[in-house]
Amino acid sequence: MSTATATAPKVWTTEDLLAMPDDGVERWIINGKLREKPSEFPEVKMTVRNRHHCKLTIRVGATILSWLDTQQKPRGDVYGGELGVLLPGRTGTVGIDVAYANAGVVAVQDDDETTLLAGVPTLTVEILSPNDYQEQIHEKTREYLRAGVAVVWVIDPDDQTVKVYRSGHPAESFNITHRLPEHPAMPGFAPTVAELFE
């Protein structure tokens, strides 16, 4: 009689992710599990977003930058375009559409050539794309909150809504007629939803 032994599933790390080929497949790691989504354009060896997604990414980043320009130094920084983030205490890397990292997080980065941000952003923003799966977005949102991100925005370009997630609070949805709640760690930052879509 033979006994089959079950092997534990592989726990993926950032090093594993960085060693993967650049083959047009979008990959990220959540809770040590590899997530993959084939590119809409496999002949292009990079993550490709539609122009509406890209425009919204810029608008959100510009809105944060406008607020940031009113703040005293030292200030944090704004990142966009699938920023790779190493969240402390989490297994793996996540890609974020737009993120604001405060001055403390920015100050501890190794150098400007680092491809990944190490630390917890103050605000993360996910912009839904037509090929995003709701469960993947919810999983990423939960991962951000567990890692200590204070506020997560999930923007739906089709409905022109923003869903705001905060640890310990139920998610809140805001439409084009609303002002977003002020971020607790970003005094005075409370843009209207309309500003993000104008």
What are these regions (language model features)?
Residues M1-E198:
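Gly/Pro/Ser/Thr-rich low-complexity, intrinsically disordered segments predominantly at protein N-termini
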